[in-house]
Regions:
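Active-site acidic/histidine proton-transfer and metal-coordination neighborhood
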Residues: 1-60, 69
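A structural alpha-helix within SAM-dependent methyltransferase catalytic domains
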Residues: 13, 17-20, 24, 49, ...
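Short, basic, helix/turn surface patches
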Residues: 17-20, 59-64, 115-116, 120, ...
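Structural preference for beta-strand elements that scaffold enzyme active sites
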Residues: 27-33, 57-61, 85-87, 96, ...
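Gly/Pro-rich active-site loop or hairpin
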Residues: 41-45, 49, 66-120, 128-138
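C-terminal helical cap(s) of enzyme catalytic domains, especially alpha/beta-barrels
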Residues: 134-149
Length: 149
């Protein structure tokens, strides 16, 4: 059966709400990540904010490389969502999968803003389909060490 975008979002919110309630009983915080698919209800700032309004105890994994899918400004996205962010994925974008700092996302600037905002959590490096994952990981780790130690 065909479901509209809104129906899918409502079902997703209901399921997430149930998961969050069960997890809370176990002392677990549930996070949702902005997703890099134009058809996803969590691919844009407004979609993420809607889920946060529906599920007050749902938290965010902020992925630096995904808001570009909706052509949204990464700094605007951070400011809109930062109060609920408890984890950050460092992902840069290029024509191919690239190391953090090698693509067109302003990684040094956005990660600097995140740190300046008081974020004290981890920065997880994320690459999707890199030809040489090890080399990409080493370059990304070096970028983070050189700029954020």
């Amino acid at each position: 059966a065909f479901l509209s975008h809104n129906e899918k979002a409502l079902r997703m919110a209901k399921g997430m709400s149930d998961i969050v309630a069960r997890a809370k009983k176990q002392g677990i915080q549930v996070v949702i990540e902005d997703f890099d698919n134009i058809n996803s209800p969590i691919a844009c700032v407004n979609g993420m904010k809607w889920f946060m309004e529906q599920i007050p105890e749902l938290w965010i994994t902020f992925d630096t490389g995904n808001f570009i899918i909706h052509k949204e400004d990464i700094f605007t996205a951070w400011e809109a969502l930062k109060e609920r962010v408890i984890h950050v994925h460092c992902k840069d974008r290029g024509a191919e999968s690239v190391a953090v700092g090698d693509g067109y996302i302003p990684m040094k600037e956005i990660l600097g803003r995140i740190v300046e905002s008081g974020y004290e959590g981890y920065f997880a490096i994320e690459h999707f389909d890199a030809a040489d994952q090890e080399k990409c990981m080493q370059r990304s780790a070096a970028f983070l060490r050189d700029n954020f130690q």
